[in-house]
């Protein structure tokens, strides 16, 4: 699979500007690109509560349809984020459109970041995977990647590749780079993180997008703010699982905790009990 890590600046609450930049990136992608991955809330940026009515979209909104049309015309799958309106609520949502222009996967961010998500979005509650270019692909959004359980949930759905649509700001940029390497190793799958760049609402976004193989090796990373390409080979997944498989060999599902205390209430021992 050939992936374009399409990190780019995002104009908060300016859907038309962001859509134009996305369409240009899709149309000008190399012809052999299988999947283009954009950052978190690509279309909307980070809206305030008052801006939701202006930038919020349903999955049938015109900007979404235009991206579907561009994916179909370019014969390329596209993963992107937006502010979704549904059932009277707003969600920080990612969509994966396949090369035919069909919405193959929709994911709502499950772990909301206090500064930009709380009070604006409702949290999602489900994980999903779909097949793109012969790989099973799942999606996470930004803060999600800091919780091992999120990536493990996708691995339990047999994900070969975890995409992270990121909107991580300074000074936290390195946190997600470390996390995505760990998640790839823990689940013996590929992981691709795409972060936004530039400034927005007093925040600075460093980019530092990266693709990681199932051994935790960095395949490509962006060091100059420009998009980069990665080629993922399925054989690497099988190689990483040849001698051991974490999903098969794990015991703690779930883990129980047993504490031993003295008479004055001090904890003496903590034992982890495999479920």
Question: Over which residues does each language-model region extend?
Answer:
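Active-site-proximal beta-strand elements of phosphoester/diester hydrolases
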Residues: 1-14, 37, 93, 106-109, ...
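C-terminal beta-strand edge segments of enzyme domains
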Residues: 129-131, 196-275
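Short loop/turn motifs at secondary-structure junctions
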Residues: 2, 31-32, 136, 158
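CN hydrolase (nitrilase-like) catalytic-core segments centered on the catalytic cysteine
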Residues: 62-79, 146-229
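Conserved hydrophobic/aromatic positions in well-ordered beta-strands
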Residues: 4, 95-97, 105, 210, ...
């Amino acid at each position: 699979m050939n992936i374009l890590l399409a990190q780019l600046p995002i104009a908060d609450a300016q859907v038309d500007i962001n859509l134009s930049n996305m369409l240009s990136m899709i149309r000008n992608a190399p012809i052999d690109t299988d999947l283009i991955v954009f950052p978190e809330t690509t279309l909307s940026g980070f809206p305030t509560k008052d801006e939701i009515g202006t930038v919020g979209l349903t999955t049938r909104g015109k900007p979404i349809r235009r991206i579907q049309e561009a994916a179909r015309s370019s014969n390329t799958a596209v993963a992107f984020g937006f502010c979704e309106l549904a059932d009277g609520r707003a969600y920080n949502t990612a969509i994966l459109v396949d090369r035919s222009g069909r919405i193959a996967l929709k994911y709502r961010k499950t772990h909301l970041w206090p500064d930009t998500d709380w009070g604006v979005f409702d949290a999602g509650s489900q994980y999903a995977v779909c097949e793109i270019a012969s790989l099973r692909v799942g999606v996470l959004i930004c803060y999600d990647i800091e919780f091992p359980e999120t990536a493990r949930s996708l691995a339990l759905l047999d994900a070969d590749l975890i995409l992270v649509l990121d909107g991580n700001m300074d000074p936290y940029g390195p946190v997600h780079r470390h996390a995505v390497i760990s998640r790839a190793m823990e689940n013996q799958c590929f992981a691709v993180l795409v972060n936004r760049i530039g400034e927005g609402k007093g925040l600075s976004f460093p980019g530092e997008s990266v693709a990681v193989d199932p051994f935790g090796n960095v395949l490509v990373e962006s060091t100059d703010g420009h998009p980069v390409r990665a080629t993922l080979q399925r054989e690497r997944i099988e190689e990483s699982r040849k001698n051991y498989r974490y999903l098969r060999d794990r015991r703690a599902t779930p883990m129980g905790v047993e504490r031993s205390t003295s008479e004055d209430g001090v904890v003496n021992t903590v034992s982890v009990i495999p479920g």
